Amino acid sequence: MDGVTVIDHPLVQHKLTIMRRKETSTGSFRRLLREISTLLCYEVTRDLELTMETIETPLQTIESPILEGKKLVFASILRAGNGLLEGMLDLVPSARVSHIGVYRDHETLQPVEYYFKAPEDVAERLIIVVDPMLATGNSSIAAIDKLKERGAHNIRFLCLLAAPEGIRNFRAAHPDVPVFTAAIDSHLNEKGYIVPGLGDAGDRMYGTK
């Protein structure tokens, strides 16, 4: 699928299978989400640009590669996005963080925005937007709309699961934003849930209904 990368690393797929199981506990689900987010972050950042820096090791002075440019921004779509955020910050602790409050109205399936906080200079940074589920795509589309209104243009979207319907909607709205996911599932049901999916990621992560 054009513009979509499926991260099929064996460890990612193994952990995802355990997360899908309905008997997986809240604590285990949360831990696995943190672990899998680190692996996903590794893949979504593999082409970051490097520059050479002169450093001193205990033995000699050398030229060594280091990330070039301003720090990344991880933009979490609340609340479930925070589950991915933690593992990514373990890997890139210097990243800046944006929080975007968008929830899906369960009657209309449309996004409702309630919060937005991001660094002022998002136009100068790579933004990685995170949300475990790309279902209808409406929430992620709305979140990226807000970032673009602030001048952001170098954006990537990272999720755990995606539905074909959500991918189509997302790519139609933001064809310039690549999507990274661990799996593309079959379809959405009448309630807008990904099938076979893993249920509501936020509820499973926080033990709510």
Swiss-Prot record:
InterPro entries named among the record's database cross-references: PRibTrfase_dom, PRTase-like, Upp_B, UPRTase/APRTase, Ura_phspho_trans
EC number: 2.4.2.9
Residues annotated for uracil binding in this entry: 194, 199-201
Binding site residues for 5-phospho-alpha-D-ribose 1-diphosphate: 79, 104, 131-139, 200
Catalytic activity: UMP + diphosphate = 5-phospho-alpha-D-ribose 1-diphosphate + uracil
CDD domains in alphabetical order: PRTases_typeI
Enzymatic class: transferase
Keywords carried by this UniProt record: Allosteric enzyme, Glycosyltransferase, GTP-binding, Magnesium, Nucleotide-binding, Transferase
This protein's pathway: Pyrimidine metabolism; UMP biosynthesis via salvage pathway; UMP from uracil: step 1/1
Cofactor (UniProt): Mg(2+)
Cofactor note as given: Binds 1 Mg(2+) ion per subunit. The magnesium is bound as Mg-PRPP.
Listed GO MF terms: GTP binding; magnesium ion binding; uracil phosphoribosyltransferase activity
Family annotation (NCBIfam families): PRK00129.1, upp
Record function comment: Catalyzes the conversion of uracil and 5-phospho-alpha-D-ribose 1-diphosphate (PRPP) to UMP and diphosphate.
Full protein name: Uracil phosphoribosyltransferase
UniProt organism field: Rhizobium etli (strain CIAT 652)
